[in-house]
């Protein structure tokens, strides 16, 4: 009876989960290009499998093989003495198998053990492509799921039939799988979500999730601290139907009046923790992220969830608020802020945090509904593949716009540096070890670099030239430069933003060669009648016969004595000119002073006696008469 009740509640939750979502499940698709034979050449769609390791950001070409026996790949190919291992220098093997009779994951595992590089599953129904997923039920041999590393894809029945027909006719079928556009990569920052759960008693899936959190934490924190990513954790919740609100099942699995629920960890209501404990811890983790994100340290969430899993496991009966608060305090976060965010879980009211989580579950645009735990969403596209550090990191790295990837995406275990072989076919200055090859996650680009503040200009493939004021400091701006007899000449000029020009005294292209100009033979200098010319490297020497002196500015020889006499004559003329000017100034000064004094004396005398030439005196005499 207890088991019946448990399954009844599980069925109700699944039904409610689907009915409450107005969105839909989106199949993540990828491009598959058939390059031969001519009859089926073209680009087709295929659906990414939700297991294995898709080569996000990369591509793979191979030859298709359709086995003569074990065509559904439900058995070990070794039993049929079939091997798909590539020959030396041969193309990788893409094995095509039929859908049906066993799990998709088992088909992939058998193909991988036989040496296949990729498995293509041909649909057996004329339907839209679906997502191949791992089995939900746990079996005794389910450990192989974690060991599947080859990519997988589902192709339509029509394409599968066309490939089989071509192989039957003896035509080699070559296919290229391209994952470079599987995820959008619009800019230099990747937004991704992790839909997770605090439950650690759900078997192998919970164990795999905790292992992933611990192993991925370092990379996630590097990306977040560097501002390369914008991470958000999410938690799936359901609500209890109104008809079951008074039931024991809803009361032990839900909070806030049945609005937010989680399944019982052990699927046994009579022992251990219940769904209510899980939903509360999920809410606490969501609030922890909110508080730390507001303080500018969102990466602390990774420390909290991994520390909580270690210090507060259900098996040790520490999965509670007391243990959680200790972890929160150890990370320097205010517990009161977390509690305030959590709010009243017993109130018959909506919780803003969990309400947003329910809304976020519904797919929008190109993203489908979130129905599987765990789920990773990268740039609004659901990740398909293994929950493994390197696989997820590759997917994240493929979400960056090319040339904006962080250093962690360019390590050897993540991608192949294509600049190491023949410099990627790009321009290179071996003298200064400057190259235009820039390694990217998807391959490489040929782009003229910026070195020590100096920008190089060019096509990046055959030519790059330093530009700007500081360009001569880097390999002399790529221009000619030579030193002889203690003298150094350069064709690079700091006052020119680009280009090379041979200095005066040289002629050439300025890049590879500048030849000395013989001014004596070219008759461009030292050509006066008494001049004697001698060419030097980069210049010339000019002398005069006898006691003559060479004036370089005027290209002339003059007499040293004549030059001295001339100089003294100029000096005497200047002295005499200054003397004449002083004498003239003194004469004018004396005349003006004398005139001024005479007028002053006459004015004084006119006050005491009449003067003959005083007009005021004559006017006074006329008035008296």
Curated annotation (Swiss-Prot):
It is a single-pass type I membrane protein. Disulfide bonds join 419-437, 426-446, 448-464, 472-492, 479-500, 502-514, 544-557. Residues 589-625 are cytoplasmic. Glycans are attached at residues 147, 293, 433. Residues 55-167 form the PA domain. It is found in: Membrane; Golgi apparatus membrane; Cytoplasmic vesicle, Clathrin-coated vesicle membrane; Prevacuolar compartment membrane. This is Vacuolar-sorting receptor 2. SUPFAM superfamilies: PA domain (SSF52025). One of its GO terms (biological process) is protein transport. Expressed only in flowers. Residues 1-19 form the signal peptide. A motif (Tyrosine-based internalization motif) lies at residues 608-611. Pfam families: PA, VSR_TRX. The keyword tRNA processing does not apply. Residues 20-567 are lumenal. PANTHER family: PROTEASE-ASSOCIATED DOMAIN-CONTAINING PROTEIN, PROTEASE-ASSOCIATED DOMAIN-CONTAINING PROTEIN 1. Vacuolar-sorting receptor (VSR) involved in clathrin-coated vesicles sorting from Golgi apparatus to vacuoles. Its main location: membrane. Residues 415-465, 468-515, 516-558 form the EGF-like domain. Keywords: Calcium, Cytoplasmic vesicle, Disulfide bond, EGF-like domain, Glycoprotein, Golgi apparatus, Membrane, Protein transport, Repeat, Signal, Transmembrane, Transmembrane helix, Transport. It comes from Arabidopsis thaliana (Mouse-ear cress). GO terms for molecular function: calcium ion binding. The tyrosine-based internalization signal may be involved in trafficking at the TGN. The chain crosses the membrane at residues 568-588. Belongs to the VSR (BP-80) family. One of its GO terms (cellular component) is Golgi membrane.
């Amino acid at each position: 009876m207890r088991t019946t009740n448990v399954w009844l509640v599980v069925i109700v939750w699944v039904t409610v989960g689907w009915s409450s979502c107005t969105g839909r499940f989106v199949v993540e698709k990828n491009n598959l290009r058939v390059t031969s034979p001519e009859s089926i050449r073209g680009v087709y769609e295929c659906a990414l499998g939700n297991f294995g390791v898709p080569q996000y950001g990369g591509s793979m070409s191979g030859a298709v093989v359709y086995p003569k026996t074990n065509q559904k790949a439900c058995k070990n190919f070794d039993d049929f003495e079939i091997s798909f291992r590539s020959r030396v220098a041969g193309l990788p093997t893409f094995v095509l198998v039929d859908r049906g009779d066993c799990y998709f994951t088992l088909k992939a595992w058998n193909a991988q053990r036989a040496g296949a590089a990729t498995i293509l599953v041909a649909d057996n129904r004329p339907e839209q492509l679906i997502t191949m997923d791992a089995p939900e039920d746990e079996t005794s041999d389910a450990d192989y799921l974690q060991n599947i590393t080859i990519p997988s894809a589902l192709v339509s029945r029509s394409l599968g039939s066309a490939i089989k027909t071509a192989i039957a006719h003896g035509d080699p079928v070559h296919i290229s799988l391209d994952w470079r556009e599987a995820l959008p990569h619009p800019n230099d920052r990747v937004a991704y979500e992790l839909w997770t759960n605090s439950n650690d008693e759900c078997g192998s899936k919970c164990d795999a999730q905790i292992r992933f959190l611990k192993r991925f934490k370092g990379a996630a924190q590097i990306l977040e601290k560097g501002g390369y990513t914008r991470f958000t954790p999410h938690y799936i919740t359901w609500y209890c139907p109104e008809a079951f609100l008074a039931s024991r099942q809803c009361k032990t699995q839900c909070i806030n009046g049945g609005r937010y629920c989680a399944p019982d960890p052990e699927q046994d209501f009579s022992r251990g923790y219940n769904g209510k404990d899980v939903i509360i811890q999920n809410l606490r983790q969501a609030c922890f992220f909110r508080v730390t994100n507001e303080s500018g340290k969102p990466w602390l969430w990774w420390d909290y969830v991994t520390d909580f899993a270690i210090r507060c496991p259900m098996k040790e009966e520490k999965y509670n608020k007391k243990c959680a608060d200790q972890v929160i305090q150890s990370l320097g976060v205010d517990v009161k802020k977390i509690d305030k965010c959590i709010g009243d879980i017993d109130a018959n009211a909506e919780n803003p945090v969990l309400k947003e989580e329910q809304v976020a579950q519904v797919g929008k645009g190109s993203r489908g509904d979130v129905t599987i735990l765990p789920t990773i969403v990268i740039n609004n596209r659901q990740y398909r593949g293994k929950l493994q550090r390197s696989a997820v990191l590759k997917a994240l790295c493929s979400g960056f716009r090319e040339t904006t990837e962080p250093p962690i995406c360019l390590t050897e275990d993540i991608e192949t540096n294509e600049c190491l072989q023949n410099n990627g076919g790009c321009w290179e200055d071996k003298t200064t070890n400057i190259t235009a090859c820039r390694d990217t996650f998807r391959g490489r680009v040929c782009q003229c670099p910026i070195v020590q503040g100096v920008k190089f200009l060019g096509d990046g493939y055959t030519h790059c030239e330093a530009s700007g004021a500081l360009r001569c400091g880097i390999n002399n701006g790529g221009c000619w430069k030579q030193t002889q007899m203690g003298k150094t000449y350069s064709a690079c000029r700091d006052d020119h933003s680009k280009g090379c020009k041979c200095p005066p005294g040289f002629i050439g292209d300025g890049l590879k060669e500048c030849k000395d100009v013989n001014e004596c033979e070219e008759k461009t200098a030292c050509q006066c009648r008494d001049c004697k010319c001698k060419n030097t490297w980069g210049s010339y020497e000019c002398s005069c016969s006898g006691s003559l002196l060479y004036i370089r500015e005027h290209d002339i020889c003059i007499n040293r004595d004549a030059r001295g006499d001339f100089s003294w004559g100029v000096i005497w003329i200047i002295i005499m000119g200054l003397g004449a000017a002083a004498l003239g100034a003194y004469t004018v000064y004396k005349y003006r002073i004398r005139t001024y004094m005479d007028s002053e004396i006459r004015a004084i005398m006119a006050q005491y006696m009449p003067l003959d030439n005083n007009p005021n005196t004559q006017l006074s005499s006329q008035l008296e008469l």
